[in-house]
Amino acid sequence: MSMVKEFKEFALKGNVMDLAVGVIIGGAFSTIVNSIVKDLIMPVVGLATGGLDFSNKFVRLGPIPPTFKGSPESYKDLQTAGVAVFGYGSFITVLINFLILAFIIFLMVKFINNLRKPAEAAPAAPPPPPEDVLLLREIRDSLKNSPR
């Protein structure tokens, strides 16, 4: 079997196509989760912590270059200038994104698994008794009904 033919069979299998669709949808879904965290959750967390903005929390590790034109308090400005920064606030935001995404995927998988379970059917009727048992019952009934 040629390499091209084997690859074609592999690529056109249902699982590979499902995976491709999942990756595309996951990329789009990731954008939604990022927006939820950045625009909805982090402002509430910031409000609860007294206006703390996690996305701009960092520790500067390197010197600021003399040609730097920006705010030394801005994470993005320092990063753009090539200053080494330890951006723990950005990491916290990404971690929250991951946890939300993982939880939503968990719920989706759980829902799909529940759909895959066969419906609980009513108990099936017992199988009919074998012919020899039926014959023995007939004999028993005829003996009961016959005079002695």
From Swiss-Prot:
Compartment(s): Cell inner membrane
The UniProt record lists the keyword Methyltransferase: no
GO cellular component labels: plasma membrane
Single GO term (MF): mechanosensitive monoatomic ion channel activity
Parts of the chain that traverse the membrane: 16-36, 89-109
One Pfam short name: MscL
Keywords from the named record: Cell inner membrane, Cell membrane, Ion channel, Ion transport, Membrane, Transmembrane, Transmembrane helix, Transport
UniProt cross-references to PROSITE patterns, sorted A to Z: MSCL
SUPFAM superfamilies xref list: Gated mechanosensitive channel
Topology of the protein relative to the lipid bilayer: Multi-pass membrane protein
UniProt keyword annotation of Membrane present: yes
Top-rank taxon, per record: Bacteria
Main location: membrane
Known function: Channel that opens in response to stretch forces in the membrane lipid bilayer. May participate in the regulation of osmotic pressure changes within the cell.
PANTHER family: LARGE-CONDUCTANCE MECHANOSENSITIVE CHANNEL, MECHANOSENSITIVE CHANNEL MSCL
Subunit structure as annotated in this protein's UniProt entry: Homopentamer.
Family: Belongs to the MscL family.
Descriptive protein name: Large-conductance mechanosensitive channel
Gene of this entry: mscL
